[in-house]
Amino acid sequence: MKPTTIALLQKCKQEKKRFATITAYDHSFAKLFADEGINVLLVGDSLGMTVQGHDSTLPVTVEDIAYHTRAVRRGAPNSLLLADLPFMAYATPEQTFENAAIVMRAGANMVKLEGGAWLADTVKMLAERAVPVCGHLGLTPQSVNVFGGYKVQGRGDAAQTLFDDALALEAAGAQLLVLECVPVELAKRITDALTIPVIGIGAGNVTDGQILVMHDAFGITGGHIPKFAKNFLAEAGDIRAAVRQYIAEVESGVYPGEEHSFH
């Protein structure tokens, strides 16, 4: 199989072909996802909650991300692999570049950063140094203490700010953007305005791609289940069939449905 590239996702956007992505944290699941047709994987700092058992993503370190990135890369050698830079790992441009180098050497193709226009200079610095960047707007879990919890973002007056943030990140050189927990109407406006692919999670079926935390997709998340999540394993019966169903529903636009969306 040929390596999946950012250019391929760009082509999907241009041809209006939706694509499915998912989080992965280990060799076995990475291989399974790649074998079944999900070729864009994220080593997310969500591992702090799903793998390590913390109540937020804040305790995750760069070393944690690098460890799991190496494992995922071994399982999915041809996948496009995104890796989060965790909380406090990109406070300065110099620190950002050093930490990006660590996860890129571990096997990532791209780093993901949470934040808006204030990150533009950092994104530009990375892009100029051949480090591909995925932005992340809306509900950014590293800011949970600022938001006061996990809440929908981009409603009312905040919509224009979030829209402007998206434009600023693209202008700075970001090549992908994740939108999390934003109203469908705003997600469509941003997706239509940007030339780069937009991946949604809790942003309706109007984005170019979708992503889910794998534990949510298989119904093995303890405690609160996000509105946007769907347990594909419950319907499909086994994990491989669940992955195929997830892909099919994303590509057809069936998932996410109205019941998974915000307004």
Swiss-Prot record:
Binding, Mg(2+) = 45, 84, 114
Q: In which pathway does it act?
A: Cofactor biosynthesis; (R)-pantothenate biosynthesis; (R)-pantoate from 3-methyl-2-oxobutanoate: step 1/2
GO MF terms held by the record = 3-methyl-2-oxobutanoate hydroxymethyltransferase activity; magnesium ion binding
Compartments, as annotated in UniProt: Cytoplasm
Enzyme group, top EC level? transferase
- Keyword Protein biosynthesis assigned to the entry: answer is no
**Catalytic residue list:** 180
Subunit info? Homodecamer; pentamer of dimers.
Q: Which family does it belong to?
A: Belongs to the PanB family.
What protein is this chain from?
3-methyl-2-oxobutanoate hydroxymethyltransferase
